[in-house]
């Protein structure tokens, strides 16, 4: 459950480290696979994404439990997102950590192919 003012880790190598959600698109609460508008709160130096930059991101992990249709529930240790461009492609070239299978259903195939593990 991601809402405005929620801090998220960045799960790619785009240069940002922490994001703060400022808007969830088309919903009140964001879940895995939802696109958010966020502001970069921490960033690495000498990288293309700078601190205080407003970016679009897709949620890939949430600490809130997800109940799947087959009865299985899944929960991650942190809230994480991958920064994307207007077309929905990731701005980084690598994705760190596991991601949920729900991204495949939402047509974020490029992120799924970059991920080391899909749960």
From Swiss-Prot:
Keyword Ribonucleoprotein: yes
Highest taxon, organism lineage: Eukaryota
Protein's cellular compartments: Plastid, Chloroplast
Quaternary structure, from the entry: Part of the 50S ribosomal subunit.
A molecular function (GO) term: structural constituent of ribosome
Any one of the GO CC terms: chloroplast
InterPro entries xref list: Ribosomal_uL14, Ribosomal_uL14_bac-type, Ribosomal_uL14_CS, Ribosomal_uL14_sf
Pfam families: Ribosomal_L14 (PF00238)
Matches recorded under SMART domains: Ribosomal_L14
Keyword Transmembrane helix recorded: no
Descriptive protein name: Large ribosomal subunit protein uL14c
GO biological process: translation
Keywords: Chloroplast, Plastid, Ribonucleoprotein, Ribosomal protein, RNA-binding, rRNA-binding
Family membership: Belongs to the universal ribosomal protein uL14 family.
Function recorded in the entry: Binds to 23S rRNA.
Species this protein is from: Ostreococcus tauri
């Amino acid at each position: 459950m991601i809402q405005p003012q929620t801090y998220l880790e960045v799960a790619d190598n785009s240069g940002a480290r922490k994001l703060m959600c400022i808007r969830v698109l088309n919903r009140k609460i964001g879940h895995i696979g939802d696109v958010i508008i966020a502001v970069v709160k921490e960033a690495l130096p000498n990288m293309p994404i700078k601190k205080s930059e407003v970016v679009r991101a897709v949620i890939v992990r949430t600490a809130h439990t997800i109940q799947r249709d087959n009865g299985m529930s899944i929960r991650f240790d942190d809230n994480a997102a991958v920064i994307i461009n207007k077309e929905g492609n990731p701005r980084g070239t690598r994705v760190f950590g596991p991601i949920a299978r729900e991204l495949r259903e939402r047509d974020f195939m490029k992120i799924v192919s970059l991920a080391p593990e899909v749960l």
